[in-house]
Amino acid sequence: MDLPRLYVPATLANLGSGFDALGVALDLYLEVEAHPAPEDAFLYEGEGHVEGTDNLIHEGYRAGMRALGLEPFPLRVRAFNPIPLARGMGSSSAALVAGVALADRLSGGRLGREGVFRVAAGLEGHPDNVAPAVYGGFVAALSDPPLAIPLPRPEGVRFVLAVPPYEVPTPLAREALPREVPLEDAIYNLARSALWPAALSSGRLEALREACRDRLHQPHRAHLMPGVLEAIEGALEAGALAAFVGGAGPTLAALARAGEEAPVIRALSAYRGPEGRTLVLGIGEGYFWKET
């Protein structure tokens, strides 16, 4: 049984103030084709180098099947991945969501989208990446209990992404965080994370300039991403509605009104560096299937 082609979006987690709680999908998609086979097989094209059946797509598929009480049968998977690896754009979450979504499809939809989120979030541990990959757009998410609520999606905006040529592994970025934070810093972030849904609901996008500010993670990780704090301020000065590090970094994301991306791109060029790249992307949809 051949399945339709599966598309799973890249994502940005944290959005500055919403550490481990807020995320957004981008219109850049991991593409996956799969069908049952005599033995597992994995064919990969795209960013980085991934091989073997011990990969995140197969891992997600096996977890999804077992969550349904089913024994996973062998699956031949072909993946094309344009999402940069270890850059803070949710490549791992996209792969895990793809695998769990394959299990859901092959079981006749027994997990449902909520079940796909629950299983994938349990594997990934970062619901702020998994939730937008499942539901699309902006999402607020919890891991315990697993819960995700989509937020209003603004029209006429684009993300400018400055993607440096180096990686920041998530475990290294986690190690940079303090185990305790001052109460005033916690309050600072709580207040600003609440501004995200308020600004998106009301259409007052100018409030995102303050909503994206953070004291809990970006300052502590800045030494892993030289010039990142200055680049965030530069993007805001150039007219960005919001600017923040994508996930654990090093990608820097700036939200701009459509047609006003050029000065933001220029402001981020030094941070990106001559060997890095700039992507301009819209807000993405949650995973979907398309007949080939």
Swiss-Prot record:
GO BP of this protein: threonine biosynthetic process
Swiss-Prot/TrEMBL keywords: Amino-acid biosynthesis, ATP-binding, Cytoplasm, Kinase, Nucleotide-binding, Threonine biosynthesis, Transferase
Coiled-coil segments: none
GO CC, alphabetical: cytoplasm
Residues binding ATP: 84-94
Gene3D superfamilies: 3.30.230.10, GHMP kinase, C-terminal domain
Pfam families: GHMP_kinases_C (PF08544), GHMP_kinases_N (PF00288)
Keyword Lyase: no
Localisation: Cytoplasm
Catalytic activity: L-homoserine + ATP = O-phospho-L-homoserine + ADP + H(+)
E.C. code: 2.7.1.39
GO molecular function, one term: ATP binding
Pathway(s) the chain acts in: Amino-acid biosynthesis; L-threonine biosynthesis; L-threonine from L-aspartate: step 4/5
Entry-linked HAMAP family: Homoser_kinase
Biological role: Catalyzes the ATP-dependent phosphorylation of L-homoserine to L-homoserine phosphate.
Family designation: Belongs to the GHMP kinase family. Homoserine kinase subfamily.
Official protein name in the record: Homoserine kinase
